[in-house]
Amino acid sequence: MFSEEVLKNVFPLLEGEDLASCMGVCKQWRDIARDDFYWKCQCAKKWPSVCKRHKPPTETYYKMYQTFSKRRLNRALPPPRLSFENLEFFIDIWSEERLVFSGLIPGVALENGIETLPLGISNVLRTHLGRPDYKMVVPAEPRFTIPLNQSVSVSVLVARNDSDKVARIINRSVFDYIDRSSYRALAFEYLDLSPCYPFISGIRAWISLLFMDVEDMNDDGLLDVFGIQLDFNDVADTKEEVLWLLDMLDWK
């Protein structure tokens, strides 16, 4: 085993990652490497100005190095303050000015999705719905049809049962894109977030109409809609992220 004097001469020459690895070798190495002098040397390499103080900006130089030396890419979210049990979604869909669907959807229904997919949907759409990315899907009950040659728009509001507040997600957005290969009609809206988040913008809510497979999809035909999908896949890929995003809405 190396003598203590040898280690004390070598440790200041190491890079931070190597010094941290040395702490796991044995108790002797760990006790020596925990000396804050070595971590002051590491901080001096990365941020020379912090050593102009008489003491570290944080409790120790070791804590400062461990906290700020690497960019944390995957930070765990705290538990969301909202739950789907306390949410209700109001979805209204118009074909031109004719109301074709109006649904009060409990949050848990959107969370649970469509348990049994109907027969007659395309394999592409079936694969899309089976992907692991988080999406909220609900059956269209009752089923409805929309003409391809008419403008179809949608509004979505969400209410909180725990505070009697409502927020807007989508405001009469038009389904101006029909993905005929995946049997979806898509619309989006940029979210209105609370003024508490002034530096966040450009987050979209996407809503899709899921329709049955048809042999001949011409411009004069009808789309048989069996489901509605809502997601925020630009930024939110998990249930927790979706709930935090909903919590950030401009609740009134």
From Swiss-Prot:
Classification via Pfam families: F-box-like
Residue ranges annotated for the F-box domain, each copy included: 1-42
Protein name, per record: F-box protein At5g39250
InterPro entries: At5g39250-like, F-box-like_dom_sf, F-box_dom
Positions of transmembrane segments: none
Leader sequence segment: none
SMART domains attached to this UniProt entry: FBOX
